[in-house]
Amino acid sequence: MAQPPRPAEEYDDDVQEDEDELKEGELDDDESHEAASEGGEAAAGDEEAEDDEQDEEDGDEDSQPWAGLNRLPERDDMLDILNELRAEGRKQLTVLLLGKSSVGKSSLINSLLGEAVVRVQAFKLQADTDITTTVVRQVAVGNSEVDGFRLKLIDTCGLEDPEAGDTVNLGALSKIAEDVRGVGIDVVLYCDRLDLYRVDPLDKAIIDAISSTFGRGIWRRTVVALTHANLVQTPPGTDYDSFVNGRVRLIRGAVRGPLFFRPSLPVALVENSETCPVSSESGFRVLPDGEPWLVALVSQLVDMAAARRRPYKYHPRLSSKPSHRFRWLLPVAIAAEVLFYRRFLHPRLDDNQRRVEREEERVWALRGQQRRALGLHRPHRPDKDAAWRLEQMYDDD
């Protein structure tokens, strides 16, 4: 298989880095002083109370029975996987879907739930009227172990500008962030198409905008969903596995960037079309490599959620602030500059100034000798104030 489900243990390396990065952006200078005072402690207590209240609201949120689950051939396998979270005391799996228009986000929700709950636009003629659409389904299959578990899916509009087409819709992205503010996000599902050959500048701009809005740590709880994965024919010189691996490598490279930011970014291949092949043995929808994609997708989501101790909750302070992002480096940079100036630059400047002064003395002495040889008075050497005025006169000319 091109992308087999990854065990939850492989995500553990990112957990501590995720928490550290989120904490790094949480407190700006003013909040740091508040946290050291009684007022800051009270504010922190109020915020924690708000989080608890939000958790209770999420638990009481209206949900409908997951009727489409019984129509899915993969039902039993999906329930077994979801039961892993239920066994850990989790009552809900919340997934936020992000990506461009026409990559299959809404279709993926319909496929996952087994029912048409989200409107799908075949042709993108205008901007989405709804920025976010939330669907909550509750398991009710007569099994006490898993009944009551909720699956919450948050669909979002395309992140490209509907008018320009080649720029990021930052307004929509900000509205998405505000809509999910305070909502516990277990997994982010970043959707793109498999049947493309490159990551274009718009893709990179969208990825950067997501990082700036939600914080780079959001990618450590992201699963990449590549739709249109039923590729019957791949480009010449490639087979299915090599093409998938190449596409995955491009997307991961665009997200990870240079240096030390290396989120795992597991990948799930998706085929929402009704023409997707079906296994003659199990009845599961399978990809060209034989993988039952819906079961693999649910497994990736559960693995990612299980690897995180707490869900992600958006707050504006997590957004990238160029003036605050590396503020802790400012004292270090200033100290390094002062040390460099005192140890290296200042002695060399003083030495150079002394050489200039000695050269000027030598030139004026030589001029005096020449004028005495001619029987003239010694040259008039202007003082510093007169010399400065002469320089200004020449500069003005």
UniProtKB/Swiss-Prot annotation:
A motif (AKR2A-binding sequence (ABS) required for chloroplast outer envelope membrane targeting) lies at residues 350-358. Residues 1-72 are annotated as: Disordered. Its cofactor is Mg(2+). It is found in: Plastid, Chloroplast outer membrane. GO terms for cellular component: chloroplast outer membrane. Belongs to the TRAFAC class TrmE-Era-EngA-EngB-Septin-like GTPase superfamily. AIG1/Toc34/Toc159-like paraseptin GTPase family. TOC34 subfamily. This is Translocase of chloroplast 34 homolog, chloroplastic. It comes from Chlamydomonas reinhardtii (Chlamydomonas smithii).
